[in-house]
């Protein structure tokens, strides 16, 4: 029982219903003006550039009422003294650009370098147990500076792309699980500043007229540079998270697929496809106030092996396939909720078979 109910001597039976009702809304208005272009510096060298102006307007309303006549509380239900009737808004504008150089070093081969600015607009955490004191503050905009150099190759049989990149993000917007008030929610927060660096390679190779190989590999290191302690947490109880991993950022991912087309004389082709996909381990939540990750939030690495066989018609405009997903029947989770027992398990976490139809117009 809440203190108010106690003062009245009101008892709470096991089957009593204690509830509250929340009415909430959010409105997001965005408009932008952008343009890009290419200027030929020479026959082999080009300057690429672009500019974008963005205007965001975000507003919310929230009204929550405790429905119990005695103001009693329950799991996820705050007392009547914390009923809300709040509204707020935030406006944000941004000017971001991109500039780069492309140079053709030989026929079908190009090297390039680019600098790009990124922007993600502001927002609010509006949910059932909204607390105006903390949640009424807007989530600030996220801005980034990205650098990339790379190499591209294109011929009749091979397409190859290689890139090295580094991105500095300020005001990184991240989801953080909050299990206060007896119920877990996902709270968006400006976690701080992060850096992402890595290298990527992908290719498509026509090994024969009938066999095509497609693959890629990415090594990425995403780390927290500076962490912003939540406003509701005492600064003395909040430790430095510098150097720790950014959630949902596996260090290594790679894939390889093969497809073989067998032509027939009956107006359709038969195809066989197989793929192998690997995803490294990753954390699904930000580190806690102690600067340590919850061990349960570490999602193990996993491998996916898929296969399919089918028929294609009219130059692959239509396909009918028998599919097999997760042939190794390897279970995995994609998200941890932060409450020590709840994970999000995707459909592909179990082996299954089916029929698929695809059409292109």
Where are the model-predicted features located?
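Structural signature of Gram-negative outer-membrane beta-barrels, strongest in the C-terminal barrel
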Residues: 26-168
